[in-house]
Amino acid sequence: MMRDAEERITRLEETVAHQLKTIEELSDQLAEQWKVVEQTRAKLDRLTERFLSLEEQAQDATPVTRPPHY
């Protein structure tokens, strides 16, 4: 009976160790993904500013008119 309890405790300890390792790996992956999200967000902000600037410049430009023969 005591041997069964020891084996069970050993299995539980192994399971906990495996779960801790998995949690650590997932945490590292999450941190890496968060960096990618932040970089993507910064790039989107820059592209949005650039687009708005170009759109504003296009509104200020003289419109392209068709030649009279069209």
From Swiss-Prot:
It comes from Rhizobium meliloti (strain 1021). InterPro entries: SlyX. It comes from the Bacteria. Signal peptide: none annotated. The lineage of its organism: Bacteria, Pseudomonadati, Pseudomonadota, Alphaproteobacteria, Hyphomicrobiales. This is Protein SlyX homolog. Belongs to the SlyX family. Pfam families: SlyX.
